[in-house]
Amino acid sequence: LNLFAGPNSSGKSTVLQALLTASDNVTEKKGKHGLKNRRTEASNFNDVRNFVTNAKSYEIGISYNGEEPTVLCFTPGDDSYQTTLVEQSADASSDLLGILGSDNLLYLPATRPGGAYVQPINPDSENKLGRNGEFVIDYYAKHRLEPLDAALILAPGTQTLEGQVNHQLDKLTGYRLVVETVGNNHYVKYETRSGKQLFPYHVGTGVSFITEVIIACFATPRGGMVITENPEIHLHPKAQADLIDFMAKVAKAGVQIIIESHSDHLFNGIRRLISQEKLALSDVSVYNFRQDGNGLTRAERVEFTPQGGIRSYIPGMFEQFDIDLDAILKL
């Protein structure tokens, strides 16, 4: 379970975009090719190069289970910097190719739509959830009756995607997801515990957004990776705390989860789970991002004690609650 925290524009999403770019561009054999950007909006070299250092190239290095990193070097493909060439330093291992494959790496951006009654059918078989998470409901509708990996069966009595999603959704919100497919569209409603079906815009936006996160977690196979930006969107603090409990269980089942968030409830939820011995220190990594005096990103790993305490204080990290409370109490 991984959490990226820190101020706006400090580099958190850049790391996620680097992972997605690597997923798009790493190949079995070393060599050179043009940039592929199926998962990101970065279409030319100028979009992503470091302007602070006036970079004429940049690299993404990625390794799996302690292997030597596979390095992708990106250079401009023309004098205008409008195109990009990618050169891969070495052959990629089957393990690395596996975890970066389109079936094993799923992504929910902060720009995911959420809340719509009518949802489209996905024409792209290689991008299960869509570039912006617009096809999460489509994935659910197509796979809802399929059994999940045994490790991802978190609730007894059901083994299907539909059963597990609705168990968690009911537990977190009191609703169940109902999807009807007619023609080229899916129609979404939420069912109360009394059996009444409601349109998404009648149940609160947070229900739709948490539904997408739950589906994405269950859609990721054991050994795969799910990246989600701001899973706490539109959620009450109690729901945020319950959500991190769920995501920790999915991570414990063997799914690599990467969260980008500004929520102190998720951060403190991780600390609580550590203190309750429900999350091992070896199974969690939290990084705080900041910009240094030169405008460059620095990422500091947050170290925890077995009691959920923070070993070394990092200025500015989730301290606003304490600042406000001190002001209220005039301390």
Region locations from a protein language model:
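C-terminal lobe/lid and adjacent interdomain/linker elements of RecA-like ASCE P-loop ATPase modules
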Residues: 242-331
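Phosphate-coordinating catalytic segments in nucleotide- and nucleic-acid-processing enzymes
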Residues: 25-216, 221-222, 295, 300-331
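Walker B catalytic acidic pair
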Residues: 229-230
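Phosphate-binding glycine-rich loops of NTP-binding sites
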Residues: 2-43, 204-216, 246, 252, ...
